[in-house]
């Protein structure tokens, strides 16, 4: 059953009456621009046709009752009182967003019954957490008729994940889930929050292949990567690595390498990756899919060798995909790293060959069964 239908039927089953409204927030996949968002850089993701559905109804008090359908767990808290952190991680995503919505809009004290479900695979690098944050943020906005923009909801979602959940993520995932556009990739400037939509190339599909090796950003090495980037930014005397051009990096690279080898490698990735995103925009405008494929390949190599966030299973998937796709199109790891998914921009006529090559080889080599999704670029959060 699709998530929208599921959240509505399960709401009624669980609470004993029908929900009033439903919000759907999509997951996202990033075509290029990895670990650049928290360096104030550029990214090029799209919202996907998988996401989080939240069905809800107003209560006549200030209690929130939350039913997480997929794990069959519940939460309850009073939003007129201080909202405490929970030992259950999923509850903190919901509580954190509500808490920071209230900081922005202190008048928000509307209680609600909520049932939520997602078809974004957890810990896959497709932003199941951002879809949850944005769907809850939009739910608050609708419940209280609050005067907040989608971009603000995105930044509140990021803040909840940073401060309340404890994952030091950037803002790309939340911005994409909030502001995605159907049939478009969105180039986001993570400093100014400017968004430039670019149509998905005609005759191409977005294929996502999940390695089914799970990652966890809170306990993973994500936070240490962020610290290494901040060290490099301080070395260059700038606010963020976005402010260092490739030429400036080359000029002082040897000095940084001597001082801190890891910071050197991380900076090399971020600075070159920012440049690749800008080149990718130009390649798409020119419909130069060969160039885009080269950029995606360079991005993957940089994540593997300099940012050191790929794993053998992911590298193997990318190798297989590159063989199947050929020169027109590309493949790379997508998401935070240490598992998760690869993304492929693949000509329509090669989708089945790609699926077949991976089905014949990946499990044989790794002992793990992959999951293959063909996605469409979708609109951001919406009331359905």
UniProtKB/Swiss-Prot annotation:
Query: Which PROSITE patterns does the UniProt record give?
Result: GALACTOKINASE (PS00106), GHMP_KINASES_ATP (PS00627)
Which pathway does UniProt place it in?
A: Carbohydrate metabolism; galactose metabolism
- One biological-process term from Gene Ontology? galactose metabolic process
Entry GO MF terms: ATP binding; galactokinase activity; magnesium ion binding
Q: Which residues form a coiled coil?
A: none
**Reactions listed under catalytic activity:** alpha-D-galactose + ATP = alpha-D-galactose 1-phosphate + ADP + H(+)
Q: Where does substrate bind?
A: 34-37, 222
Does DNA repair appear among the keywords?
no
Location of the active site: 173 (proton acceptor)
Matches recorded under InterPro entries: Galactokinase, Galactokinase_bac, Galactokinase_CS, GalKase_N, GHMP_kinase_C_dom, GHMP_kinase_C_sf, GHMP_kinase_N_dom, GHMP_knse_ATP-bd_CS
Sites where the protein binds Mg(2+): 129, 161
Q: Keywords in UniProt for this one?
A: ATP-binding, Carbohydrate metabolism, Cytoplasm, Galactose metabolism, Kinase, Magnesium, Metal-binding, Nucleotide-binding, Transferase
Give the Pfam families listed for this entry.
Answer: GalKase_gal_bdg, GHMP_kinases_C, GHMP_kinases_N
Q: What is its EC number?
A: 2.7.1.6
Q: Its biological function?
A: Catalyzes the transfer of the gamma-phosphate of ATP to D-galactose to form alpha-D-galactose-1-phosphate (Gal-1-P).
Entries under NCBIfam families matching the protein: gal_kin, PRK05101.1
Protein name, UniProt field: Galactokinase
Q: Which organism is it from?
A: Glaesserella parasuis serovar 5 (strain SH0165)
Q: Which gene encodes it?
A: galK
């Amino acid at each position: 059953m699709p998530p929208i239908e599921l959240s509505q039927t399960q709401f009624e089953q669980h609470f004993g009456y029908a929900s009033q409204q439903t919000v759907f927030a999509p997951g996202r996949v990033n075509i290029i621009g990895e670990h650049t968002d928290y360096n104030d850089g550029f990214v090029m993701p799209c919202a996907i046709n998988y996401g989080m559905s939240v069905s809800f109804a107003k209560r006549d008090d200030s209690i929130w009752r939350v039913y997480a359908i997929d794990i069959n767990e519940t939460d309850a808290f009073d939003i007129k009182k201080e909202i405490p952190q929970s030992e259950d991680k999923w509850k903190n995503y919901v509580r954190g967003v509500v808490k920071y919505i209230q900081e922005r809009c202190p008048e928000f004290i509307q209680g609600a019954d909520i049932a939520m479900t997602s078809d974004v695979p957890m810990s896959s690098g497709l932003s199941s957490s951002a879809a949850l944050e944005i769907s809850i943020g939009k739910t608050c906005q609708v419940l209280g008729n609050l005067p907040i923009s989608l971009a603000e909801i995105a930044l509140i979602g990021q803040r909840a994940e940073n401060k309340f959940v404890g994952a030091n993520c950037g803002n790309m995932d939340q911005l994409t889930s909030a502001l995605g556009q159907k049939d478009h990739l969105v180039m986001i400037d993570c400093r100014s929050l400017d968004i430039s939509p670019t149509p998905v190339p005609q005759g191409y599909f977005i294929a996502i292949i999940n390695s089914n090796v799970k990652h966890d950003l809170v306990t993973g090495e994500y936070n240490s990567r962020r610290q290494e980037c901040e060290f490099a930014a301080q070395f260059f005397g700038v606010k963020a690595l976005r402010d260092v051009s490739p030429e400036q990096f080359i000029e002082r690279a040897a000095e940084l390498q001597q001082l801190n080898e890891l910071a050197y490698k991380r900076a090399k990735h971020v600075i070159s990756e920012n440049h690749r995103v800008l080149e990718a925009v130009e390649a798409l405008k020119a419909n130069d899919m060969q160039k885009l494929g080269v950029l995606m390949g360079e991005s993957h190599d940089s994540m593997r060798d300099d940012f050191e966030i790929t794993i053998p299973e992911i590298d193997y998937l990318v190798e297989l995909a590159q063989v199947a796709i050929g020169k027109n199109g590309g493949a790379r790891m997508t998401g935070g790293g240490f598992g998760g998914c690869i993304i492929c921009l693949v000509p329509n006529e090669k989708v089945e060959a790609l699926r077949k090559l991976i089905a014949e080889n990946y499990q044989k080599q790794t002992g793990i069964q992959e999951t293959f999704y063909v996605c469409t670029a979708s609109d951001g959060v919406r009331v359905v």
